[in-house]
Amino acid sequence: MLFRSDLKPLLKRKDIALVSLDYKVEDKIDGVYYPECAENTENYDDLAALIAELDMVIGVPTTAQHCAAALGVKTWCLVPKYHQWRYAQPVMRWYNSMWLVHQTQLDDQVYKDGKLTFTRRDRSWKEVIEYVEKKL
């Protein structure tokens, strides 16, 4: 599971501005723009208009990722190690503008009292974020 806090290294970059396309964000990070249109999950017109104005979209597989790629916006999709079949290749077969960045290690997962919890979660996504940062 990728956490917003995992993206903090990208905040150090002065040449990029981060815009959250998530909805119902509770743990907001300073330095990230949270547009109101991302909160409206019943009408994606405003969100699609915002996405069309972005230079690039980076994030885990979501509706926003697919919308960005369908609009032709350069999109890097951060794919978990265990993923659905459509994310198996380095590129998405339906969109020329989507490139898939695969996680190569798993988070350390522990079942405790019947609930899945994560320990040392930063170990696996750290390498993905470092790779993305180098490629930007």
Give the residues covered by each predicted segment.
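Short, small-residue-biased leader/transition segments that mark boundaries at the very start
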Residues: 1-2
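Short catalytic helix/loop segments, enriched in acidic residues and glycine
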Residues: 5
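Donor-binding and catalytic core of enzymes assembling or modifying cell-surface/extracellular glycoconjugates
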Residues: 8-76, 80
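Nucleotide-sugar donor-binding patch of glycosyltransferase catalytic domains
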Residues: 29-31, 36-37, 66-135
